[in-house]
Structure formats: C-alpha cells, structure tokens
Amino acid sequence: MLFHVKMTVRLPADMDPERAARLKADEKALAQRLQRDGTWRHLWRIAGHYANYSVFDVPSVEAMHETLMQLPLFPYMDIEIDGLCRHPSSIHDDDR
C-alpha cells in the first residue's frame, strides 16, 4: 500500500539543543535505512518549512502507523496521511 504523508516538525522552543541534535541525527539515520529498504519511497522537503512530503510503501494501515511511531521526531510532528492508488489515466505502471 502506498501512502502520501505530510510531516510537519514542531520542536519546542525550549528544547535542549543537544537533545534536538540527537533526535535529528537519529531521525536521519532511520529515514535513510527505511529509504534503502524501500519502505520510504520518496522524501521531499517543503520549501520554507520544517516539513516534508513523503511516499511510503507498507503492507497495511497498521504498518504505516507503526512506521511513523518509530520515528524519533514522531512526538513533535503533525502528520497528515492519504492512501494512494494508481490513476487509470497514468501512462506508467509504477513510479520506480
């Protein structure tokens, strides 16, 4: 199942800078691992915002939820999720 996900990060203004740096480093490492294994198919920064648009490929809604919950920055994110399916007018069978 493909999901389009918008993630907006909202770190508290008073968060310890070292803790924020650790969370960001851990987030980057996990995001890159998920990209390498094909779970996190696309990752795009939204210009001018601490936010991204992503496409995930997971087996179920539950797996999508679990994947997002394991992100180190999850507690500080506003997340919007939409399920995706192939459009009948698309000239491509896949996006890879």
Which stretches of residues belong to each language-model region?
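Conserved, structured core segments of small domains
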Residues: M1-R96
